[in-house]
Amino acid sequence: MGARASVLSGGKLDKWEKIRLRPRGKKRYKLKHIVWASRELERFAVNPSLLETAEGCRQILGQLQPALQTGSEELKSLYNAVATLYCVHQNIEVRDTKEALDKIEEEQNKSKKKAQQAAADTGNGSQVSQNYPIVQNLQGQMVHQAISPRTLNAWVKVVEEKAFSPEVIPMFSALSEGATPQDLNTMLNTVGGHQAAMQMLKETINEEAAEWDRLHPVHAGPIAPGQMREPRGSDIAGTTSTLQEQIGWMTNNPPIPVGEIYKRWIILGLNKIVRMYSPISILDIRQGPKEPFRDYVDRFYKTLRAEQASQDVKNWMTETFLVQNANPDCKTILKALGPAATLEEMMTACQGVGGPSHKARILAEAMSQVTNSATIMLQKGNFRDQRKIVKCFNCGKVGHIAKNCRAPRKKGCWKCGKEGHQMKDCTNEGRQANFLRENLAFPQGKARELSSEQTRANSPTRRELQVWGRDNSLSEAGEDRQGTVSFSFPQITLWQRPIVTVKIGGQLKEALLDTGADDTVLEEMNLPGKWKPKMIGGIGGFIKVRQYDQILIEICGHKAIGTVLVGPTPVNIIGRNLLTQIGCTLNFPISPIETVPVKLKPGMDGPKVKQWPLTEEKIKALVEICTEMEKEGKISKIGPENPYNTPVFAIKKKDSTKWRKLVDFRELNKRTQDFWEVQLGIPHPAGLKKKKSVTVLDVGDAYFSVPLDKEFRKYTAFTIPSINNETPRIRYQYNVLPQGWKGSPAIFQSSMTKILEPFKKQNPEIVIYQYMDDLYVGSDLEIGQHRIKIEELREHLLKWGFTTPDKKHQKEPPFLWMGYELHPDKWTVQPIVLPEKDSWTVNDIQKLVGKLNWASQIYAGIKVKQLCKLLRGTKALTEVVQLTKEAELELAENREILKEPVHGVYYDPSKDLIAEIQKQGQGQWTYQIYQEPFKNLKTGKYARMRGAHTNDVKQLTEAVQKVATESIVIWGKTPKFKLPIQKETWEAWWTEYWQATWIPEWEFVNTPPLVKLWYQLEKEPIIGAETFYVDGAANRETKLGKAGYVTDRGRQKVVSLTDTTNQKTELQAIHLALQDSGLEVNIVTDSQYALGIIQAQPDKSESELVSQIIEQLIKKEKVYLAWVPAHKGIGGNEQVDRLVSTGIRKVLFLDGIDKAQDEHEKYHSNWRAMASDFNLPPVVAKEIVASCDKCQLKGEAMHGQVDCSPGIWQLDCTHLEGKIILVAVHVASGYIEAEVIPAETGQETAYFILKLAGRWPVKVIHTDNGSNFTSTTVKAACWWAGIKQEFGIPYNPQSQGVVESMNKQLKQIIGQVRDQAEHLKTAVQMAVFIHNFKRKGGIGGYSAGERIVDIIATDIQTKELQKQITKIQNFRVYYRDSRDPLWKGHAKLLWKGEGAVVIQDNSDIKVVPRRKAKIIRDYGKQMAGDDCVASRQDED
């Protein structure tokens, strides 16, 4: 009976009992064979519940098959039974066991062949990525399969949506699996618009490439024939290598994985970018006092992804910080779970935890008891590998059950231990038999309910046993999906055995609700009426029972009359004969729409906004609307216990007398958790493929069909007021998604997607585009079949409570969808009418621009720049705007364009995409995307100016990138471009301009006006032309400035300027030089700012001054522009600097530059040290560092310090040139002691530690777990010197991070001075000197040597001060106020100065002159008066 319930359902059991044991034999399979098989599996320590599914049977067969050759007859019989059961589960028709074994063998052979075929297909490329495989062609050559548009599309979306948050890195890593450098560059180029991020990335790549070149020097001599050259850093980055070379390196033997190396560099750069965009440390992530544990875990893992550490370190961080930074309530529970708890167990345990701390203690105790047993509130399905521990009731040993126990039978009850009754008659509630091979969720065995939220969190297949009756009303809107039966409590979860109290013949009994049992069987009891004997099959074989008919049973408040069997059953069972009468069913989660759990933001409470007064007609309208909504179950009335409120009001519908209810959810929206938008953009008709049959549907009352989370409903409360407070106000809350609430769109979209998924899988030929409640359904079926499918879809939606009203069901073209008009072979935007007005307000212009932007996607040539100019500045919406002549002209042109209706066509995947761009002038561009000429898919415009100064080539590349990105989003691939620029012009700009970004494949098209560079800067100085040295200076306070030039022919000029800046004066100087020079000119500036602007060759600018410079440049025949560093004593530059600095700059020339340069050549000091020691401006000191070829590669070392106490040192061994360097770092200051040691032994390390302790106060040393540090010699040395030794974990902020960083810096300095020393040990000591005394920065701007002395001195002073304070507190003070002759006190002495003392009398702190205070020592007795004792102590 129980086995039948758990293994085979009724229909399958009939099939089982028809199968013969042997071919043409008489005996057939019976229920007892399943019972026997389950017992045998227990004997072999295999989970018997695997028999319940085909997959489980397949797993058992896999375990048994290897043992068949040597196994016993019993094992073979078990294999045969399980094989037959597998065929029954899989609905494979077999007549006997032999046929079943043949079918199994046939299936195994097929799967083997498939595996072999897959292996053959994959070949050696099994390790190659599936995204971008390098495959072998028919000729045996390794060829590259280009990156897919789908992958590019995914990458662009990730960057646009995540905006360089931590998730970008794992996403990039996944999408770029196995990519070549060319693929990686394509990925980077598609997001080239993010210029700041890309510049950071470029810098990282350059640094890593330089490091690669340093570590992999080029081998001298020619390359041997047939050998490949070794890749340089720039080859790995794909800039100087071809695709074939990259493939060659990656497939060579041995391979050089250039793709993986480049990917690693990019990820390093992305880490930096992520750090910039989300600078949160994992240490800052702490759980709020009331924050749900699940939300805390989400934040924790999001930040963890951004941490720059290896996976091992991240695992350690998770183990340590996740529990450590939880709030006290959760931390108590997590510690009780033990160190080996999984994340799922943690989430389960902390579900709903919060409130008083005693609640957490109670839960912790409960959890510690639960964790001691084998089952921890988790379904068996979650941990498939766990074996059930079988324990004998008789002897108590593990491994067998009482029936098979060989020990003598134990007297008394196995359940409670008392004599006089057996276990089946036991009334003790303590422990229950392990019936039907199910684990109890709680050891106490009491039936407890878990909330549906917990069930969903813990169980992958949420099952609930629900009991209902037809007379019960619906408890929640949106849950009644059956039509005939409405749900009501109780809902009994299957988290544990569903045991309920039932009333039978006036007696109360606990019984198990068993939907798998046919009959109701109860343990021995007296029932009224006649009975007849019967035999039934049970777990332990057959049992004899008494059958009573027409017995009244009450279950959960529902009555039923039926047959009851009474006999020796180990547990009372209510079977299907009674459960069906009371309407009990087993429910899986696919019935009603599952509510999405919603929370408020951590630490926030619901809205409490007062309802404002409403007019009588509005109140009447709201009452009428709410009454109707309440009848439909969308809202329900609430009492005064709900403290939350949101204001409600009513407006009249457009062109109607009907009213519409609006709720102002702004306050609730601020307090509600954030949601991830499922859809970030709307689908575009140009991306639709042409379909034979099309239908457009609209979901009616979309939001009101989806239930709102029960726990969140209280926050949606609103109130309808009454006139003059006649009656109490009516209060409601929402049961469904409200209009205007921030969560409604995301929850509706995700619910709708889940509901449509099964229909899409069943009907792959149907294309469904879903955006909110609009559905576009297309297919290539004949119209009749298509309409049948549409009806199926409507019925499918109706099952889930979504209606598709006929009024909005569009069957015939043109279809109105998402603001578009769709025809069978073309599309357009819905008709656009531009208003005719005499006066335009700001709001009118905004609406007009919106309409024109919408029209521009199919009407080519639309312009809005002049209209947008009218909206500049902060203006009120109702302010009247006067149209300029340019704006009127632009509007008239747009009206002309819109007169003729224009249509777009649909996408054909078999044809290429082509995009053509034209220049319209005034920084505006228009483009068309098509597959066939004159049949546009879509059109558009671009008019964005990314910088203040730009030129047409730069704008053209920006327009191209916009079109490419748009194409990837709509069609998943980039088009071929036709651009109005000649190749020569493009190449001239591309080669010179450092910030030039990638554009896809393109060709020149002669569509005037052509894009051209209006002037060209020369690459070399112009011989014979006059050279102008230009400079400018401005005073920040007075805003006065000068600009001027000095020429190599003795000419000079200076002009005075007012209200200016340094940057403006530098540009003004260049303008002067261009004005006063001939057709050819050389200009030398020391301004990087001016150089950067002019080298980009702008032809338009928002700056009037730059526009004037552009005019002058266009007039010239040749211009050469050069930059020199300022204050370097360069002839003309120094003269003009003196000229413009007079009376403007406070500091002129500095004598210390030469000395600083000499010092830097010897010690390679950083710029802070030089600025401090030689009194140089930072810009000059930085320039000296930048011009040093040994310092410019890596830039500045950061001197961030860990906040540690003064006595802590970190020690570590590092290796260089095959020798060992032992490094000690004073953590608080960064001061280094280092030595080359002959061997990494305990003896050498101990000697070094004793030397260190003899020089500096060492209290604690922190080391790794190296054998030299853990040796007894080092321990003995530390014990003798009184040093505490600690061992750390790598990268723990209080562990080895500081010394690891210092090792790197020390090696860098050694590299800079290595050529100055013959031996490494000399170079090490030189590097230590430079680091400790020639590098400044970090805390206080000191060098490390200055900092350690300062820290130790401060520590000594602080300790001495503390001693004095402690000493002072042993005194009492009696004092007199100015007018009062009486002595007051005693008071506490806080400080004793020369002329006064600071005292504390009660809570008041006072300053009293010394002459009016008597200070006495506290001897523990009361002392008062101006006596000799007090006098003697006066001067103490």
UniProtKB/Swiss-Prot annotation:
Where are the residues of the annotated region Dimerization/Multimerization of capsid protein p24?
Answer: 277-363
Residue sites binding Zn(2+) per the record: H1160, H1164, C1188, C1191
Ranges for region Interaction with host CALM1: 8-43
List the gene name.
Answer: gag-pol
Q: Where is this region: Dimerization of protease?
A: 490-494, 538-544, 577-589
Return the annotated region ranges for Interaction with host AP3D1: 12-19
Q: Which Pfam families match?
A: Gag_p17, Gag_p24_C, IN_DBD_C, Integrase_Zn, RNase_H, rve, RVP, RVT_1
Further comment: HIV-1 lineages are divided in three main groups, M (for Major), O (for Outlier), and N (for New, or Non-M, Non-O). The vast majority of strains found worldwide belong to the group M. Group O seems to be endemic to and largely confined to Cameroon and neighboring countries in West Central Africa, where these viruses represent a small minority of HIV-1 strains. The group N is represented by a limited number of isolates from Cameroonian persons. The group M is further subdivided in 9 clades or subtypes (A to D, F to H, J and K). Resistance to inhibitors associated with mutations are observed both in viral protease and in reverse transcriptase. Most of the time, single mutations confer only a modest reduction in drug susceptibility. Combination of several mutations is usually required to develop a high-level drug resistance. These mutations are predominantly found in clade B viruses and not in other genotypes. They are listed in the clade B representative isolate HXB2 (AC P04585).
UniProt protein name: Gag-Pol polyprotein
Which residues catalyse the reaction? D514 (for protease activity)
Zn-finger regions (CCHC-type) at which positions? Answer: 390-407, 411-428
**Zinc finger (Integrase-type) residue ranges?**
1151-1192
Please tell me where Mg(2+) 3 binds in this chain.
Answer: D1212, D1264, E1300
